[in-house]
């Protein structure tokens, strides 16, 4: 049987098409998912400082299917500290995208040439960086400890982070350096990513109380939020940073819940820290289901222990996830903040309180009365939409 013959022109055209397809696929630089695990899931825990995001990050980090990093964009702000938050948005977004794709070369611009795992910000809170293939401190399925991991794993080669990242079905990043949702639209519509956003919010009055305990540690970031061209801001008596944080939460929530773009459907989840404190396992099951994870018995025991400690935790533990009474933590501001400050926060953050479902107090008596529930029921129908473009009180 005679086979059909093709002209050299046709063959060249076919070869060029084949080459073009190959170049396109390679240029996307989409790493394959771990064998047998299906499409990789990317999760961004989007929050602000002192809102319980480190705790939520640990809920993901300790899961055996998750590669987790805490605030990788810290390195962007550390290197470009004279910039403002809006000016740094694109650099932060580009770094986040690269890390989601397990491309750790993106840190070349922000870290020393010779680097170890310990050069990553808060590296030891990542269970994935304390277990194989990075380190042998913990078996891959075990709950990790920052204190144990640090001395054993600090000098491990940085390149192992990329190898570890590529071996997990889920990549989860916690970040506090986005102040609107629109900057993330390119990631949400990126075919290389399968992105879910967990938007964690907390009562602004509780946030203020926690910020006051950690003022020095937040001074540089405060300056970037306020656009001070590199000047650190420790004292903030007019609560300008809290005001901006509240406005950003309103912008993000409105964009996601009020006429969202089609590509955001089923990819955004608003979580209030107070709901998590009241009923940890229910909220965590919902979060895991949203992100395609299962709750193991070992994780369930750890979550119970970490949320049923005694008291709100010591001040020296402000940036650590330790065993505490989660409900006590969420209510601590009602015992400690002067009512004058609470009233000021309510003036500045009225839109956020209304939108996110927090009830205002109108006297010190109401503030101290813990039988008065300040948390409104969850669900869009419970919230009256407040506009982030409304005129804010002068600060």
From Swiss-Prot:
GO terms for cellular component: Golgi membrane. Residues 27-395 are lumenal. It is a single-pass type II membrane protein. Gene3D superfamilies: P-loop containing nucleotide triphosphate hydrolases (3.40.50.300). Keywords: Carbohydrate metabolism, Glycoprotein, Golgi apparatus, Membrane, Signal-anchor, Transferase, Transmembrane, Transmembrane helix. Glycans are attached at residues 116, 142, 229, 305. Residues 1-7 are cytoplasmic. Its EC number is 2.8.2.-. Expressed in cornea. It holds the Pfam family Sulfotransfer_3. 3'-phosphoadenylyl sulfate binds at residues 49-55, 202-210. It comes from the Eukaryota. It is found in: Golgi apparatus membrane. It is an enzyme of class 2 (transferase). The chain crosses the membrane at residues 8-26. InterPro entries: Carbohydrate_sulfotransferase (IPR016469), Gal/GlcNAc/GalNAc_ST (IPR051135), P-loop_NTPase (IPR027417). GO terms for biological process: carbohydrate metabolic process; keratan sulfate proteoglycan biosynthetic process; N-acetylglucosamine metabolic process; sulfur compound metabolic process. GO terms for molecular function: N-acetylglucosamine 6-O-sulfotransferase activity. SUPFAM superfamilies: P-loop containing nucleoside triphosphate hydrolases. Belongs to the sulfotransferase 1 family. Gal/GlcNAc/GalNAc subfamily. In human, there are 2 related proteins, CHST5 and CHST6, the latter mediating sulfation of keratan in cornea. In mouse however, there is no CHST6 protein, CHST5 functioning as a corneal keratan sulfotransferase and mediates such function. Sulfotransferase that utilizes 3'-phospho-5'-adenylyl sulfate (PAPS) as sulfonate donor to catalyze the transfer of sulfate to position 6 of non-reducing N-acetylglucosamine (GlcNAc) residues of keratan. Mediates sulfation of keratan in cornea. Keratan sulfate plays a central role in maintaining corneal transparency. Acts on the non-reducing terminal GlcNAc of short and long carbohydrate substrates that have poly-N-acetyllactosamine structures. May also have activity toward O-linked sugars of mucin-type acceptors. This is Carbohydrate sulfotransferase 5. It comes from Mus musculus. The lineage of its organism: Eukaryota, Metazoa, Chordata, Craniata, Vertebrata. The gene is Chst5.
């Amino acid at each position: 049987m005679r086979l059909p013959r093709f002209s050299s022109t046709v063959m060249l055209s076919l070869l060029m098409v084949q080459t073009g397809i190959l170049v396109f696929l390679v240029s996307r630089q989409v790493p394959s998912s771990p064998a047998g695990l299906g499409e990789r899931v990317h999760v961004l825990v989007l929050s602000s400082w002192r809102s319980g995001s480190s705790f939520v990050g640990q809920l993901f980090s300790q899961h055996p299917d998750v590669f987790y990093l805490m605030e990788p964009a810290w390195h962007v702000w550390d290197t470009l500290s004279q910039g403002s938050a809006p000016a740094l948005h694109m650099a932060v977004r580009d770094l986040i995208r690269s890390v989601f794709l397990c491309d750790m070369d993106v840190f070349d611009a922000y870290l020393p040439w010779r680097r170890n795992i310990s050069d990553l910000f808060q590296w030891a809170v990542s269970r994935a960086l304390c277990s194989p293939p990075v380190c042998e401190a913990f078996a891959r399925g075990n709950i990790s400890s920052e204190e144990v991991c640090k001395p054993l794993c600090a000098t491990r080669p940085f390149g192992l982070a990329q190898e570890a990242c590529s071996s997990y079905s889920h990549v989860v990043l916690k970040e506090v350096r986005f102040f609107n949702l629109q900057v993330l639209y390119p990631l949400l519509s990126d075919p290389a990513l399968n992105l879910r956003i967990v938007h964690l919010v907390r009562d602004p009055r509780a946030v203020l109380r926690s910020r006051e305990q950690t003022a020095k540690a937040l001074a540089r970031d405060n300056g970037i939020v306020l656009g001070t061209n590199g000047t650190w801001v420790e004292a903030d008596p007019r609560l300008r940073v809290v005001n901006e944080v509240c406005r950003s939460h309103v912008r993000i929530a409105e964009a996601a819940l009020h006429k969202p773009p089609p590509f955001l459907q089923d990819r955004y989840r608003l979580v209030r820290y107070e709901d998590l404190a009241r009923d940890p396992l229910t909220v965590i099951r919902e979060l895991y289901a949203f992100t395609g994870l299962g709750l193991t018995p070992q994780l369930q025991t750890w979550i119970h222990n970490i949320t049923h400690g005694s008291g709100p935790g010591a001040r020296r533990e402000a940036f650590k996830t330790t065993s505490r009474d989660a409900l006590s933590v969420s209510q601590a501001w009602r015992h400690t903040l002067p009512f004058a400050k609470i009233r000021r926060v309510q003036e500045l953050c009225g839109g956020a309180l209304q939108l996110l479902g927090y009830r205002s107090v109108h006297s010190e008596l109401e503030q101290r009365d813990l039988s008065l529930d300040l948390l409104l029921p969850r669900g869009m129908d419970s919230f009256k939409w407040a506009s982030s473009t409304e005129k804010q009180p002068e600060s």
